[in-house]
Amino acid sequence: MKQVAIVGIQGVPAKYGGFETLVENIIGDNCSPEVRYTVFCSGKDYATRLNTYKNVRLKYIPLFHANGVQSTPYDILSMLKCLHGYDTVVILGVSGCIFLPVFRLLFRKRLVANIDGLEHRRAKWGKFTKWFLRTSEAMAVRYADVVIADNKGIQDYVRETYHKEAVLIAYGGDQVLRNISEERQMEILRKYGVTPGNYAVSVCRIEPENNSHVICEAFASGGRDIVFVGNWERSEYSRGLKQKYAEYSNIRMVNAVYDLDELYALRNWCCCYVHGHSAGGTNPSLVEAMFFGKPV
């Protein structure tokens, strides 16, 4: 049985973003019986530490959060714990890939890297951070046996910039389908205080680059209902928006929803999906929303 380690995410069960959702759809019933996965998780981000989840081993890095400035030491420490006992290491994101020249000297087996969405081009980063992420990205492409791109734009970028062929593995959307009765779906809509076809949905991390403030401002002035799902308690920016727009009853600011039945019902009966991202790679939530054939 092949032993595969996955590093670079907050962890599972998923409660954060796209890579976490990706891993949720790799493991479980989708696992090959010939592969044993180990997922490295942030001990700081999980109050309850499971030993296994969906027949996958979980190991925790206790000292760091998986995101922000701590993501680099978090990823590097995760890699160091992969030096023995694994046939393949899958790295999601480039934060810790600055370490790959050293890691490659110590780990001689298969290394797979998904470089995500040109992190160094995000407007929120300063010059040093952009340089650091650009260098980490270059190390990921150079030292990985396989580079994964989740859309053709990233695949073309890798080819043109690094003269290396990335493997294109696009996100799907069929995993959102649920065998759930219409009666149950109506119960879910009532829980969120909306009626079929009379509300919009948006699912994202609440941050400036996703134009969360623009979305709130638009719905505050327009009056249409929106169920806005995101991490509203994570940052000063998100908490500020939540406080500013708390008086608008049509803006339902909901913390991250990972109940697939609830997400299905909300998307299935909305009038449209609102997508404000201005940076990053392919957004899985957008792909999932498109699967319902709703206006975006």
What are these regions (language model features)?
Residues 2, 9-15, 29-66, 153-161, ...:
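N-terminal strand-loop element at the rim of the active site
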Residues 5-7, 189-210, 216-229:
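Conserved donor-binding/catalytic core segment of Leloir-type glycosyltransferases
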Residues 71-84, 88-116, 281:
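An aromatic- and histidine-rich active-site surface loop
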Residues 80-83, 130-147:
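Membrane-proximal helix-turn-helix segments that form the acceptor-binding/catalytic region
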Residues 124, 172-198:
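Acidic anion/phosphate-binding donor-loop and adjacent secondary structure
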Residues 154-175, 192:
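Helix-loop-beta element that forms the nucleotide-linked donor phosphate-binding surface
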Residues 230, 238-260:
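Nucleotide-activated donor-binding/catalytic signature segment of Leloir-type glycosyltransferases, i.e.
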Residues 265-281, 294-295:
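Acidic donor-binding loop of glycosyltransferase active sites
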